[in-house]
Amino acid sequence: MKKTSLAILMMAGMMGVSQVNAANVGYIDYGKVQDNYPLAQSAIKEIDSQTLALQQYMVDKEKQYKALDTPLKKQNFETTTTKEFQAKQEALVKLKAQKDELIYNKIQAAAKQVLVEQKLDAVVDYRVIFVGGVDISDLVIQKLKTMN
């Protein structure tokens, strides 16, 4: 009888400990947050604008190329244009990387604030959660809008 009572008490104690250690996990839909974040939208517009400008640059250069009359002029033009295009393309890639990093850092900072406010133990991407967790995407979006 004593052993049975002791076993029941131990199991009850273990159940209590396991419930105390249960983690509160939040998750965000990064795409949704990014789509509803004004800074991200303006960055996308800026990058799209730069991409269109680069495409227009190539169209203009193609017209200039067709107007050249000698093979030497064409070869020199190709060399110059290739260097200019690569420089512009690298600048665009660098701009996109900078904007992506800035947006990611701001979303992460907002998610950290929501984590603290909601007393969560972790925040993960929604694709990692199969069952359970708390969707904090809207809270992160609200936090981002008040941070700016």
Please place each PLM-identified region on the residue numbering.
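Positively charged n-region of N-terminal signal peptides that target proteins for export
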Residues: 1-4
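Bacterial N-terminal signal peptides
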Residues: 8-16
